[in-house]
Structures are given as C-alpha cells and as structure tokens.
C-alpha cells in the first residue's frame, strides 16, 4: 500500500468499522478525483466479545474497537471523528446514533 499523506477536512474522509465474530476492522479512505476510494490506512483487532454475531461482552468489544480505530488512525495519520459501522447478526436492530468515538 502506498502512503498518501494529504490534509483533508473530515467531510472528505470516509471511515468504515466492521464488528465481526473473529475480528474488528477499521478502514480509512477518501474519494479521489476519479471517484475511486483511496485507502489511507487500516486497523484490525481480535474480536473476543462477539459470538455468532451477538455481542456478549461489551467491554471486550469496546476494547477491540478502540484498538482497531487507534491502529487505523496511526497508519493513516488522519483524525477519526465519525465512522460508518456495521455488525451482522440475527438479533440486531438499526438506528442512527451519534456519540464520542
């Protein structure tokens, strides 16, 4: 992965967070002039608080999210203020929410 260090304003940065049974992954990127997503950095942590798509230990899950987001921040050099988060499973419901990251 080539290192691209540009100064962006937060609306230009796109951050995805995936909380899964085996890993928690974060990716940081932006849309380039051609409309393609350029990856600036990523983070990955073991998911120890999720089983079969269900969060059974919120503290372990939060710890994994913090590790993944911190790694993505360190690798991308970008401030992460907002994320698009996803978690798959049978018993989830969806709502729009905002809070500290």
Name these PLM-found stretches.
Residues 22-56, 100-101:
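Short glycine-rich, Thr/Ser-proximal phosphate-binding strand/loop in the N-terminal lobe
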Residues 26-29, 66-70:
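Short, well-ordered amphipathic alpha-helices
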Residues 2, 69-81:
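Phosphate/pyrophosphate-binding loops at sites that engage ATP/ADP/AMP, CoA/4′-phosphopantetheine
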Residues 2-37, 83-86, 95:
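Gly/Thr-rich phosphate-binding beta-strand-loop-beta motif of the actin/hexokinase/Hsp70
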Residues 50, 77-101:
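Short beta-strand-loop/turn "lid" adjacent to the catalytic site in phosphate-handling enzymes
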Residues 22, 62-66, 77:
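Amphipathic alpha-helical transducer elements in NTP-driven molecular machines
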Residues 1-6, 14, 40, 47-48, ...:
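Helical "lid/coupling" subdomains associated with nucleotide-phosphate turnover
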């Amino acid at each position: 992965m080539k290192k691209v260090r540009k100064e962006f304003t937060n609306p230009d940065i796109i951050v995805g967070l995936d909380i899964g049974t085996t890993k928690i992954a974060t990716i940081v990127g932006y849309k380039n002039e051609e409309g393609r997503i350029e990856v600036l950095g990523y983070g990955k942590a073991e998911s120890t608080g999720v089983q079969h798509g269900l969060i059974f230990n919120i503290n372990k899950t939060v710890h994994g999210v913090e590790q993944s987001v911190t790694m993505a921040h360190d690798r991308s050099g970008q401030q992460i203020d907002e994320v698009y988060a996803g978690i798959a499973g049978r018993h989830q419901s969806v709502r729009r929410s905002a809070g500290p990251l």
